[in-house]
Amino acid sequence: AYFDWTNIGGLPVYASAGRRPSTGGAPLNFREDEPRGGTPLGSRINYQFDGITLGWHIREESTLRFCYGIGYESEWGNGSELKRPADRLDDASFYGLNWDVWDTDDMFIQATVARAKDVTDGFNGLVVIPVDPLTGQDAPAPAVLRFDPSVQVGDIDLASAVLIRHDGPFDWFISGNYMESDPTNETGVFGGLFTDPFDKPQSQDGHMYYAGIRYNVPNEKTKIGLEFNHGSKYWFNFALAEDDFLGAKTSVRGDVWEAYVTHRIRDRFVAKLDYINYQFDYSGSGWLLGAPKKLDNNPTLGFPTYDEASKWMLSISARF
C-alpha cells in the first residue's frame, strides 16, 4: 500500500510514502514487453522495500526524485527482539537520487546514484547450508537452519545510467553501472563485505554494462530481442526480486547472452520464448559476502557454483 500527494502548494512537486515502485525498472521491461515498472534502473535495483519519495517535475520531459527506504528492519517481528538492545543491529537503509533526464516517446535517459547504508550479513529467515562455508566439506548440522543477521558489514554506493531509443521498427538501449563498497571491520560466518571470514575487509569496486536491441514485427504484436551484459569481479546489485531460478542475470560476474521472442496475444496477455546463456567468471554472483574466486582455478567454495549454464523457457504472462 502507498499514498501520493501531488501538486503540493500548487507547485510541480509531490510526495509518496509506502511500498516503493522499485521492481521492473528500465531497461528490464524490454525483455517482458511491458511498460517500465519501477522508478530506479532495474540493472541496479530490482528489490522491494518501503519508504518515501519526494519528486520535482522540472519540466514535462524531466523529473528529479529523492528516495529513502528501509531494506532491513531490525526491530519488530524478527529474532533481534530476543537480543539485548545493545546487541541489536541498526536498520539497513537506502538513499538515492533518481533523475529522468529526458523522457519522451522516442528517447529515455535516466541517471541514478544511491547508497545502501548499514548493510547486514544476511536476512531473517531460513537458509540452506549443505556445506561448511569455511572448509567446503559437508555441513555437520542440519542443512536447513534459521538465520538472523549478526553484523553490519558496511555501506554500498551505486551509480548507473541508461539511454533508450525508439528508431523506426527498432528499440535499443545501453546502460552503464558502477558499485563501490565501504566496509566495516566486521565479518560474520559467511565473511565480510566482499571478504572471506577472518580476512580484513577492504574497499572494492565493480561495474556492469548492459545493452540490448529489439525488432518490432509489422503485425504490432511480435517482438524479437537480443541482449548482452557483462559484470566484473566485484560487481553487485540489489536484484532479489528477480524470479529466475538461476538468479538475476544482471548480477552475474561474467557474460550473459539472451535471445527472446514475445507475442502479445491480448493487451495484457503475453507469450514468450526465451534462451539465456550464462558464463560465470567468478563465484558469488548476486552475493555481497565473501571474496569472489576465479572459477577456472577450481577454487574451494562454500556453496555449489555454476561456471556455465543455459536455459530455454516458454512462458505466458497475464497482467491485472
Predicted features and spans:
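C-terminal intrinsically disordered extensions
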Residues: D105-Q110, A116-V119, D274, Y278
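Generic preference for hydrophobic/aromatic residues in regular secondary structure cores
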Residues: Y47, A111, G191-T195
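Outer membrane beta-barrel
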Residues: A1-W76, G96, D100-F108, G206-L240
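Alpha-helix capping and helix-loop boundary segments enriched in small/acidic/polar residues
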Residues: T39-I45, K83-D87, S150-V151, P201, ...
